[in-house]
């Protein structure tokens, strides 16, 4: 049994975090950018969202191949249960958010760009559905900030208070 997650799992974990930060920054800060930059910032947001979806699906498939390394010392069953619930909430959020985002853009019936490519859209716009989906997208996005914060806080609690290897299992190897 390995003491750490695989390099691939660690890489995906931190890459998803980076993409979430870029997606959030590009959409939240677009109002501060010159008007000519706004389509570019939206494209970054859309591209990051699609990349997050692909990486999260990949991460779930990899999870089936590589067992979760044990936490040492072993935490209580309640803590393990809460961790499992927290991880599945994160997986669901970061799969649902991009899917809903893609559905919003599709329903608007106008061209949108991801990765520099024109993406498909509905021939007939359905703005009511797009607006409803956008409300869910915003709600889930705001929930995700809270969940990410709890996830980071739990990792720090494990490291500094419980003094187990939870955080170390997901850290890249030291060079040297």
Curated annotation (Swiss-Prot):
Root EC class: oxidoreductase
Gene Ontology terms: cellular component: plasma membrane
Protein keywords: Cell inner membrane, Cell membrane, Electron transport, Heme, Iron, Membrane, Metal-binding, Oxidoreductase, Transmembrane, Transmembrane helix, Transport
EC number, as in UniProt: 1.10.3.17
Transmembrane segments: 7-27, 44-64, 85-105, 137-157
Pfam family name, one: Ni_hydr_CYTB
Co-factor remark: Binds 2 heme b (iron-protoporphyrin IX) groups per molecule.
Annotated membrane topology: Multi-pass membrane protein
Subcellular location: Cell inner membrane
Catalytic reaction equation(s): a ubiquinol + 2 O2 = 2 superoxide + a ubiquinone + 2 H(+)
Taxonomy, superkingdom: Bacteria
Listed InterPro entries: Cyt_b561_bac/Ni-Hgenase, Cytochrome_b561_oxidase, Di-haem_cyt_TM
Main location: membrane
Family, per entry: Belongs to the cytochrome b561 family.
Function: B-type di-heme cytochrome. Catalyzes the oxidation of superoxide to molecular oxygen and transfers the extracted electrons to ubiquinone through the two hemes.
NCBIfam families assigned: PRK11513.1
Protein name as catalogued: Probable superoxide oxidase CybB
Lineage of the species this protein comes from: Bacteria, Pseudomonadati, Pseudomonadota, Gammaproteobacteria, Enterobacterales
Gene that this polypeptide is encoded by: cybB
